[in-house]
Regions:
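Classical eukaryotic N-terminal signal peptides for Sec-dependent ER targeting/secretion
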Residues: 1-11
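Non-transmembrane, solvent-exposed beta-strand/loop segments in proteins
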Residues: 2, 15-295, 310-327, 347-412, ...
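Single-pass alpha-helical transmembrane segments
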Residues: 6, 273-278, 328-343, 412-431
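Small-residue-enriched core segments of transmembrane alpha-helices in multipass membrane transport
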Residues: 295-307, 329-331
Length: 437
């Protein structure tokens, strides 16, 4: 019994395969006959647009399915995409009376072209004006298809990968928003012979192909490391190559991209803020800590310079100041000012010691020594002649102490002024550039 069931199953599978093969052969023969009959009737089936003899433009409807956005490169000002290009037009030369009868007899709704028959019919001479480089996909087989529907409507689909030019305005970098385009045009026909339009998805077949009903679809799996795709807008862009060539029909897909700021906060802004704050440690070291304060100041200045250079290494050399340049330059000014502050302090306090001073002297500057000591009255000074030099030394010591007080006062003022100024800069910077368009 089991053996009988096994043989019956094998027989059913064989019949199904043979029926499928017979159906495919029948479809292939019908399509070959349709194309052959069209070639016998029309000599220009491959070379001329469908409505060329009727003095009206062929209307090509376009749909883009964006399967990937691989990279957006600021340095080379371009972006790389993978797309499925859908073109739809009507060619009544192929759907002649005999073709109509063959469709009715076979009860077929559509016929798929093989690669050989695709080469025998007219296909729009579409090109991408802002393309830098591109390629068709042909792994295993050529990634293209053509389908003929009743009434002569043809659907052509091809898979492409392209790198396209994308001029960028980096004045607000890295808070910038960019708009990149995919331009689509006819290469050889003016708008009197060929007109491009975005596909109007209204029929059930169209909505099955694209349930959203949009002429541009971005795959839900598309994720960019640095950008977020805010919107993709279809629009028109008629262009003229030459005065005598006429206008060429052109459509474009506008990709509105917003840069994700998270990476730059972690890799640029926080490290530079920490470097600036590190330079403030100098204000808390003693006035006499010359090696430590010099080393710290030079280290922070060199670190900021290196970081600024590494940031700009990945960007094009533009003639305007970017937002990141404002940040890095200001941070460099802060760390340089901290080093300069030490130079001022060192000049004020290069004498010997500050012994005998209390913390009260830091906030109350010494009064004029002439007032403190009173007028020098020779009658009141009863010092021996050999004590004259000792009095002069005491007077110098008082002036040395006064310079150190100024130095400490500058240090303590810097401890407050530098952080306040930096906080004001941070708030102003972020409020301005985050809200900048």
């Amino acid at each position: 019994m089991l053996e009988l069931i096994r043989h019956l199953c094998l027989l059913l599978v064989t019949i199904s395969v043979l029926a499928t093969d017979e159906s495919f052969k029948q479809r292939s023969e019908i399509l070959t006959n349709i194309v052959r009959l069209a070639h016998d009737t029309y000599d220009d089936l491959k070379t001329a647009p469908p409505s060329y003899d009727k003095l009206e433009p062929a209307r090509i409807q376009v749909l883009l399915y964006v399967s990937s956005i691989d990279a957006v490169n600021e340095a080379s000002m371009d972006f790389t995409v993978g797309i499925l290009l859908h073109l739809r037009w009507t060619d009544t030369r192929i759907y002649h009376d005999k073709a109509h009868n063959l469709f009715l007899q076979s009860k077929l709704q559509s016929l798929d072209f093989d690669s050989e028959n695709i080469k025998k019919v007219w296909v729009p001479d579409i090109f991408f004006p802002n393309e830098k480089k591109g390629s068709f996909h042909d792994i295993m087989t050529q990634n293209q298809m053509m389908r003929l529907y009743q009434g002569g409507t043809i659907l052509y689909i091809s898979r492409l990968s392209m790198t396209l030019s994308c001029p960028m305005d980096l004045i607000n970098y890295p808070f910038d928003k960019q708009t990149c385009h995919i331009l689509i045009m006819s290469f050889g026909y003016s708008d009197q012979d060929l007109v491009l339009d975005w596909m109007n998805l209204t029929t059930a077949d169209d909505l099955t192909m694209n349930p959203d009903g949009k002429a541009i679809v971005v795959d839900s799996e598309v994720l960019l490391p640095q950008f977020e795709v805010k919107s993709v807008i279809p629009s028109f862009c008629n262009r003229r190559y030459h005065q005598k060539a006429g206008n060429h029909s052109c459509i474009q897909a506008e990709f509105h991209l917003a840069r994700n700021i998270g990476f730059y906060i972690v890799q640029m802004y926080i490290p530079s803020m920490l470097i600036v704050m590190l330079s403030w440690i100098s204000f808390w070291l003693t006035v006499n800590s010359v090696p430590g304060r010099v080393s710290l100041g030079l280290l922070t200045v060199l670190t900021m310079t290196t970081q600024s250079s590494s940031v700009n290494a990945a960007l094009p050399r533009v003639s305007y100041t970017k937002a990141i340049d404002v940040w890095m330059s200001t941070c460099l000014v802060f760390v340089f000012a901290a080093l300069l502050e030490f130079a001022v302090v060192n000049v004020l306090s290069r004498k010997e010691s500050i012994s005998g001073f209390s913390l009260k002297n830091v906030f109350t500057l010494p009064k004029d020594t002439d007032k403190e000591d009173g007028p020098l009255n020779m009658a009141e000074m009863t010092v021996p002649l050999d004590g004259f030099h000792e009095a002069e030394a005491q007077k110098k010591k008082r002036f040395n102490k006064r310079g150190i007080v100024y130095a400490i006062y500058v240090d303590m003022t810097a401890r407050v002024v530098f952080p306040i100024c930096f906080i004001i800069f941070i708030m102003s910077y972020w409020l301005y550039y985050v809200n900048a368009e």
